[in-house]
């Protein structure tokens, strides 16, 4: 899995940063892409990346401010033009259905695939054999959500070397042992498959937040995450200003990461007042509180767990 930051700016596009969109690429895990927010010109950013719209399975919208949704109609239309036929699910606050359907209707856009809308409330919004996703409200004036994506633990690998050392020849019997079954060998000896399976591989946790000021609900969403993606619209000494505009500072994001025991913090949603050099200072500031912090730039790619 990896996170691809398609847009990392706040409010409006700038020369260095487009508005918000983040892709969670899971090609190895489920041959799919999940998209978090879709600001204006997201599809242009996708063309500059390795992402294929044909792999897009789900879109998650954090809130309905324009810099997070104005790219949706064009992206949905382009997916259709490119031959997309598989269903696409869009999750988001109440109003996302009306916004998308109205945009498509007024523009006379007809899609070649079905959109399934899921207007979310706090709690579990998705679960299958591989992942679960829970959401909770943040504090941004307009209803804004944070997403917690939990990968389920993977079964432990079969320790084939140990089996061979114990005299078990490779063959169909390995499949039964891999399932943890008890099997009887040709010589009459009995082995327990569970003795030859490594410990389950812990699934990853990714927390991706929409715009917010510092608020209590963030902690549970971020707790023990492998990666926390958090806005940092302002520098640390602008806490009062950030609060007035319902946003966060670098230091607030870093403090949350430390308190929540996350492994890596990635800062995004950077105000256009900060150029690339100033952004480096934002990073240094956050790292003074939480060392394993990165600052995202457009088209940056972050492998999960590294």
From Swiss-Prot:
Zn(2+) 1 binds at residues 63, 65, 140, 211. Its EC number is 3.1.26.11. It is an enzyme of class 3 (hydrolase). CDD domains: RNaseZ_ZiPD-like_MBL-fold. Keywords: Endonuclease, Hydrolase, Metal-binding, Nuclease, tRNA processing, Zinc. Binds 2 Zn(2+) ions. One of its GO terms (molecular function) is 3'-tRNA processing endoribonuclease activity. Zn(2+) 2 binds at residues 67-68, 211, 269. SUPFAM superfamilies: Metallo-hydrolase/oxidoreductase. It holds the Pfam family Lactamase_B. Coiled coil: none annotated. Its cofactor is Zn(2+). It catalyses: Endonucleolytic cleavage of RNA, removing extra 3' nucleotides from tRNA precursor, generating 3' termini of tRNAs. A 3'-hydroxy group is left at the tRNA terminus and a 5'-phosphoryl group is left at the trailer molecule. InterPro entries: Metallo-B-lactamas, RibonucZ/Hydroxyglut_hydro, RNase_Z/BN. The active site is at residue 67. Belongs to the RNase Z family. Homodimer. Zinc phosphodiesterase, which displays some tRNA 3'-processing endonuclease activity. Probably involved in tRNA maturation, by removing a 3'-trailer from precursor tRNA. This is Ribonuclease Z. It comes from Listeria monocytogenes serotype 4a (strain HCC23).
């Amino acid at each position: 899995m990896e996170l691809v930051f398609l847009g990392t700016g706040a409010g409006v596009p700038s020369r260095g940063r487009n508005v918000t969109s983040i892709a969670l690429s899971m090609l190895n895990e489920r041959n799919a892409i999940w998209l978090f927010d879709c600001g204006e010109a997201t599809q242009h950013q996708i063309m500059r990346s390795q992402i294929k719209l044909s792999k897009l399975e789900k879109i998650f919208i954090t809130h309905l401010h324009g810099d997070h949704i104005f790219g949706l109609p064009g992206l949905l239309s382009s997916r259709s033009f490119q031959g997309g036929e598989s269903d696409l699910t869009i999750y988001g606050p109440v109003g996302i259905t009306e916004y998308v359907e109205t945009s498509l209707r007024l523009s006379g856009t007809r899609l070649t695939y079905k959109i399934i809308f899921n207007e979310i409330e706090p709690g579990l919004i998705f679960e299958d054999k591989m992942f679960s996703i829970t959401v909770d409200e943040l504090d941004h004036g307009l209803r804004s959500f944070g997403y917690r994506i939990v990968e389920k633990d993977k079964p432990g690998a079969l320790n084939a070397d140990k089996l061979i050392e114990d005299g078990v020849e490779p063959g169909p019997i390995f499949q039964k042992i891999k399932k943890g079954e008890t099997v009887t060998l040709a010589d009459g000896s009995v082995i327990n498959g569970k003795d030859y399976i490594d410990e389950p591989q812990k699934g990853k946790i990714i927390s991706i937040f929409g715009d917010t000021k510092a608020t209590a609900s963030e902690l549970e969403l971020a707790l023990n995450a492998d990666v926390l993606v958090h806005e940092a619209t302002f520098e640390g000494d602008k806490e009062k200003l950030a609060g007035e505009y319902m946003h966060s500072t670098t230091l607030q994001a870093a403090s949350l990461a430390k308190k929540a025991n996350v492994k890596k913090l990635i800062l995004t949603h950077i105000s256009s007042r900060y150029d690339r050099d100033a952004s480096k200072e934002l990073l240094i500031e956050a790292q003074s509180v939480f060392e394993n912090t990165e600052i995202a730039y457009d088209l940056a790619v972050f492998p999960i767990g590294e």
